[in-house]
Regions:
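Sterically constrained small-residue positions within well-ordered secondary structures
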Residues: 10-11, 40, 216
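Aromatic-Pro/Gly-enriched surface loop or interdomain linker
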Residues: 19-113, 119-120, 231-234, 238-267
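Helical hinge/lid and interdomain linker segments adjacent to catalytic or ligand-binding clefts
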Residues: 69-157, 161-162, 190-199, 227
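An acidic, glycine-rich "communication" segment
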Residues: 22-33, 57-61, 151-239, 249, ...
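Bacterial N-terminal signal peptides
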Residues: 4-14
Length: 267
């Protein structure tokens, strides 16, 4: 299976000027039992994809912190390096610098970009709540992904404990983050590959509408992004598993992810 992701981006989205780079699909050939990369990469001089690791407080709709790991993280880092001039960090074996940390790890504060998967599965402890509060107000950024309508009743209270008094805003497509490099319009609703193969619907749960919620600090800096009714990371993880799914969702998912990463790096 071969397809030019950059070409898909240039056809489906407004992209930066200059020739698009032709790249091929990353196959899902990595060993999903690869040892977990704890801590930060050996060669940290560049962008690092950090994922928040946790032990489930409850069993929500999906399994936990490791959904789509490590393939989504690996693929996203490769594509970020290919589609932009961003330097990425690496492990000594040459792998892109995707890693995971807990809320209490010392390395947390060296992760300007932090992803959390399936946040409805977890309630932060008081110590972790204080830690995440400090992390976000000292320059950190948290992207909570793969959430669907029933999950919000768990996610919102956690965010309100971390950032008391904060307002969760439904970000409009006109927010500059969504066009900082690629013009992402409309904002994508991305199902998991499995759900899409069963139903050919973009929503995994009924007629759910996609939302991208933002939380801002007192200086109007975006500190939390919540992709609601969308599983963006599956479009990264599964890009090599199904041609139709790739063509329907990969360009949208990567365009959004790259925009978010660049926004974090420049704001």
């Amino acid at each position: 299976m071969r397809f030019a992701l950059a070409l898909a981006l240039s056809l489906g989205l407004a992209v930066m000027s200059g020739a698009a780079q032709k790249i091929t699909i990353l196959t899902n050939g990595r060993n999903l039992q690869t040892p977990i990369n704890h801590g930060l990469p050996d060669q940290p001089l560049g962008f690092t994809f950090c994922r928040l690791r946790y032990e489930n407080s409850r069993r929500a709709r999906k399994s936990g912190w490791g959904d789509d790991y490590p393939q989504a993280d690996y693929n996203f880092m490769v594509r970020l390096a290919e589609l932009t001039t961003t330097t990425i960090s690496r492990w000594n074996n040459g792998d892109p610098g995707f890693a995971n940390v807990t809320a209490m790890d010392p390395e947390l504060f060296r992760c300007p970009f932090l992803r959390m998967q399936n946040a409805a599965n977890y309630d932060f402890t008081p110590e972790e709540t204080a830690r995440m509060h400090d992390y976000l107000l000292k320059g950190g950024f948290l992207w909570i992904d793969d959430n669907w309508d029933p999950d919000f009743e768990y996610i919102r209270p956690n965010l309100m404990r971390i950032l008391p008094g904060a307002t969760i805003i439904d970000l409009p497509v006109e927010h500059p983050m969504f066009s900082i490099l690629y013009r992402v319009n409309p904002l994508p609703q991305i199902p998991s590959l499995g759900s899409w193969q069963r139903t050919r619907q973009n929503s995994e749960i009924g007629p759910s509408t996609v939302h991208y919620y933002g939380v801002f600090d007192e200086h109007d800096r975006l500190v939390v992004l919540v992709s609601m009714n969308s599983d963006v990371s599956d479009s990264w993880e599964r890009e090599g598993d199904n041609q139709d799914y790739f063509e329907a969702f990969a360009a949208k998912g990567y365009a959004l992810g790259v925009n978010v990463a660049i926004w974090v790096l420049t704001h």
